[in-house]
């Protein structure tokens, strides 16, 4: 399969300056770095391709050879000429990966995996906060070898293949390039007597109970990070983190939108027409709500400070009650008679006055049909 053009890989022109090459490399390296894409083989392959293009184009001699001969400049047997790249990657990797991934790449490669635990909360628990205890299976540091991976009383020895350097020199066309040592895999040392308890990995699988304090005001999708509670790292590497993801169950009464709570409050016909006081639910108890006379369905009443407290700002949200005027059902004969009498009183001009929205609607309907017949 033909290799891609190095300039195309970095997205730069053939006249790009060293600064433009570095800028393009930093941007792409951060995006496709294996530490940001764990287990993604396509991203890992792309990262190697980007690094190769950068190494060639930043070195004046390699770039000149590539511009003249293309990829054939690096094929085995092309020439007896040999030189080693002096390109300094320390500044690039320090700038790009120092802040994002940490400074010690060897320890980073041994870092334990992050874990995620999904926890379900009721709305009350999410709003008020609560302590929970969870049990998770994970890789913990071996207590026999203290995470070192070797039998107690023994020590690791320098790798004889790379002389403890972690890398070996390989010939590639014009150049000598460094590759990770296949014997020690870049670790510089070889464990001759691995720990029997953890098979030389420095960690074993076991379940752990962890207490979590859920702060008041969390919402769906929020994550709580517990530093160092992920899986133990390989051979003494640092532990990963545990992320607790919040899922809030649906509530039978309240709906939540950010820091506000919403609920529907049914009221009867008489209460809507004449007004009065009712009690409505809130998460901290019942609250009195005054219904004005002539209240219509859909009217919102705001009860300040009865919502959810923001974790970040401390602002307290509101409770919004939407009134629904309920049509009476299962009427007695007396109630039907009274309602008929009331309905008769709405006929004529008095009815138009009592039901202005009905009058406006039917006036509009009349104009609509009059327009069709004209």
Swiss-Prot record:
Its main location: cytoplasm. Zn(2+) 2 binds at residues 159, 162, 181, 184. Residues 5-70 form the J domain. It is found in: Cytoplasm. Binds 2 Zn(2+) ions per monomer. Disulfide bonds: none annotated. InterPro entries: DnaJ (IPR012724), DnaJ_C (IPR002939), DnaJ_domain (IPR001623), DnaJ_domain_CS (IPR018253), HSP40/DnaJ_pept-bd (IPR008971), HSP_DnaJ_Cys-rich_dom (IPR001305), HSP_DnaJ_Cys-rich_dom_sf (IPR036410), J_dom_sf (IPR036869). One of its GO terms (biological process) is response to heat. GO terms for cellular component: cytoplasm. Its cofactor is Zn(2+). A zinc finger (CR-type) spans 129-207. Zn(2+) 1 binds at residues 142, 145, 195, 198. Participates actively in the response to hyperosmotic and heat shock by preventing the aggregation of stress-denatured proteins and by disaggregating proteins, also in an autonomous, DnaK-independent fashion. Unfolded proteins bind initially to DnaJ; upon interaction with the DnaJ-bound protein, DnaK hydrolyzes its bound ATP, resulting in the formation of a stable complex. GrpE releases ADP from DnaK; ATP binding to DnaK triggers the release of the substrate protein, thus completing the reaction cycle. Belongs to the DnaJ family. Homodimer. The J domain is necessary and sufficient to stimulate DnaK ATPase activity. Zinc center 1 plays an important role in the autonomous, DnaK-independent chaperone activity of DnaJ. Zinc center 2 is essential for interaction with DnaK and for DnaJ activity. This is Chaperone protein DnaJ. It comes from Wigglesworthia glossinidia brevipalpis.
């Amino acid at each position: 399969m033909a290799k891609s053009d190095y300039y195309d890989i970095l997205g730069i022109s053939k006249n790009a300056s060293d600064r433009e090459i570095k800028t393009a490399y930093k941007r792409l390296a951060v995006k496709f770095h294996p530490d940001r894409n764990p287990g993604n083989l396509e991203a890992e392959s792309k990262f190697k391709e980007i690094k190769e293009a950068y190494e060639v184009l930043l070195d004046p001699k390699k770039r000149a050879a590539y511009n003249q001969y293309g990829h054939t400049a690096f094929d085995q047997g092309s020439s007896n000429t040999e030189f080693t790249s002096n390109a300094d990657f320390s500044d690039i990797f320090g700038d790009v990966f120092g802040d994002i991934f940490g400074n010690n790449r060897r320890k980073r490669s041994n870092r334990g995996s992050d874990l995620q635990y999904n926890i379900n909360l009721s709305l009350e628990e999410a709003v008020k906060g609560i302590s929970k205890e969870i049990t998770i299976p994970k890789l913990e540091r071996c207590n026999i070898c203290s995470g070192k991976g070797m039998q107690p009383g023994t020590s690791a020895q320098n790798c004889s293949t790379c002389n403890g350097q972690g890398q070996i020199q390989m010939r590639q066309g014009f150049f000598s390039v460094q590759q990770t040592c296949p014997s020690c895999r870049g670790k510089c040392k070889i464990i001759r007597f691995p720990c029997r308890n953890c098979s030389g990995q420095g960690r074993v699988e076991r379940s752990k109970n962890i207490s979590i304090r859920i702060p008041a005001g969390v919402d769906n999708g929020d994550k709580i990070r517990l530093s160092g509670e992920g899986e133990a790292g390989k051979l003494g590497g640092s532990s990963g983190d545990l992320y607790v993801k919040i899922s809030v169950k649906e509530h039978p009464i309240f709906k939540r939108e950010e820091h506000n709570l919403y609920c529907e409050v049914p009221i009867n016909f008489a209460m809507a027409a004449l007004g009065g006081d009712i009690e409505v639910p809130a998460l901290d108890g019942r609250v009195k709500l005054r219904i004005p006379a002539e209240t219509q369905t859909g009217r919102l009443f705001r009860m300040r400070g009865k919502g959810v407290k923001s974790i970040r700002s401390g602002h307290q949200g509101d409770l919004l009650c939407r009134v629904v005027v309920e049509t009476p059902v299962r009427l007695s004969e007396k109630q039907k008679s009274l309602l008929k009498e009331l309905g008769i009183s709405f006929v004529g001009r008095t009815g138009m006055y009592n039901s202005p929205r009905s009058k406006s609607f039917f006036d509009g309907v009349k104009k609509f049909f009059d327009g069709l017949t004209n």
